[in-house]
Design a protein with these regions (language model features):
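Conserved acidic carboxylate
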Residues: 10
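Charged docking surfaces used in two-component/phosphorelay signaling
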Residues: 17-25
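Active-site residues of response regulator receiver
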Residues: 55
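C-terminal output helix
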Residues: 108-121
Length: 127
């Protein structure tokens, strides 16, 4: 994947599609996933985004569970994570439990998201 590739993990179809389009408009490559399990499957199949943008509240494998699974896998643990959440309490719990690289509260301005993603879009070293 390109060094500006984002794995967008969001269960809300409209938000996932609008985020994906906004990121593409800003020069990012995008791989969408509807939940944590789909994201994990993509990663286990070899997807290597430079950053993961994920919601916490999703059906099935949620954002917390995905983050824990990523942490347990040495090959995936180093991929930066930007958490998005509609609930600040939820986001604060995530930060305290397992600090992400960035955390944004929904709704957010797209420029703030782009800035956060660009901070973390460095190519990962090859293993």
């Amino acid at each position: 994947m390109a060094s500006r590739e984002v794995l967008v993990v969001e269960d809300d179809t409209d938000l996932r599609e609008s985020l994906s389009q906004a990121l593409r408009d800003h020069g990012f490559g995008v791989t969408p996933a509807t939940n944590g399990q789909e994201a994990l499957d993509l990663l286990h199949a070899g997807a290597r985004p430079s950053v993961i943008l994920l919601d916490l509240m999703m059906p099935g494998l949620n954002g917390w569970q995905l983050r824990a699974a990523l942490r347990r896998d040495p090959g995936l643990a180093r991929i930066p994570q930007v958490v998005i959440s509609a609930y600040m309490d939820e986001a604060e719990q995530a930060v305290l439990a397992l600090p992400p690289d960035d955390c944004l509260r929904k709704p957010f301005h797209i420029r703030i998201l782009i800035d956060a993603l660009e901070r973390h879009c460095q190519p990962l070293p090859q293993t």
